[in-house]
């Protein structure tokens, strides 16, 4: 079976994905509140922290270009600016929450924030022994997309998007995260690794049709860190229908397809 849920030529491997929520009861005084991120599968690119007005803090931020400072009465509002990236490639982004943890943890000597900054800055999870590597999927990745804290409840939460290859033990990796960060982790969902035989009849037959139609005989099937509908059925792979580099505004209001591409897809399928 195949699903037209990705790019040609064919995806034979998809990382496993664990989506989880880490939480901890903790006092992060003098911080009043922290929040950032909108979805778990994207790098948090903006993180807002509110604190009591502090002239020394304000002075220390004068030369920083990655923080915007504003005030409202007796409250300072800090907006840390990172760089967005997909949750499968957190190394391509800059997590704004981790920028905040690094700065505030050192400035106010907050042990929990200093610990998170030290442990979570490496997106492979190596700092807390949550890493793994194999030739097909390369490094595991850890992304923390939505982070919140409220001083009145003293509850810190962070979403986890953990993606791993065939060599990983996800239970051990999550346990390592819990132990290192002193948090409680609640697993929300888990997708297993998908790995089809590149030389098997399914992949070989589909690649033969693709190459015969497009004449792109050197294109090869590939593996990804994301997930497709192929995981929802046995013996299934993602096979098209998009052609790499061709515009189409996927998932946008003006999503479209060139007729030339449509006719080529019909011929392949």
Label each region the model flagged.
Residues 58-65, 174-182, 207, 211:
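Class I S-adenosyl-L-methionine
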Residues 66-75, 181-191:
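Conserved short beta-strand edge segments in small beta-sheet-based binding/regulatory domains
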Residues 29, 51, 67, 183, ...:
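A structural micro-motif
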Residues 2-167:
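Midchain, well-structured core segments that form catalytic/ion-binding scaffolds
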Residues 1-2, 229:
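Generic low-polarity alpha-helical segments
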């Amino acid at each position: 079976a195949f699903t037209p849920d990705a790019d040609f030529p064919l995806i034979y491997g998809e990382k496993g994905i664990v989506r989880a929520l880490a939480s901890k009861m903790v006092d992060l005084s003098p911080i009043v509140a922290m929040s950032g991120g909108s979805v778990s599968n994207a790098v948090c690119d903006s993180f807002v922290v509110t604190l009591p007005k502090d002239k020394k803090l304000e002075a220390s931020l004068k030369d920083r270009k990655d923080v915007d400072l504003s005030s409202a009465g007796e409250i300072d509002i800090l907006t840390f600016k990172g760089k967005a990236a997909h949750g499968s490639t957190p190394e391509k982004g800059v997590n704004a929450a981790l920028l905040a943890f690094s700065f505030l943890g050192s400035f106010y000597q907050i042990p929990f924030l200093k610990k998170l900054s030290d442990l979570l800055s490496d997106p492979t999870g190596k700092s807390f022994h949550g890493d793994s590597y194999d030739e097909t999927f390369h490094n595991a990745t850890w992304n923390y997309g939505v982070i919140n804290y409220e001083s009145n409840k003293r509850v810190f939460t962070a979403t986890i998007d953990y993606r791993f290859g065939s060599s990983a033990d996800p239970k051990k990796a999550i346990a390592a995260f819990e132990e290192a960060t002193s948090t409680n982790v609640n697993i929300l969902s888990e997708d297993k690794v998908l790995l089809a035989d590149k030389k098997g009849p399914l992949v070989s037959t589909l690649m033969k049709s693709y190459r015969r139609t497009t004449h792109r005989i050197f294109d090869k099937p590939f593996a990804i860190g994301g997930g497709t509908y192929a995981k929802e059925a046995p013996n299934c792979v993602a096979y098209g229908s998009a052609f790499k580099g061709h515009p189409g505004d996927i998932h946008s209001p003006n999503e479209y397809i060139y007729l030339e591409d449509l006719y080529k897809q019909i011929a392949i399928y």
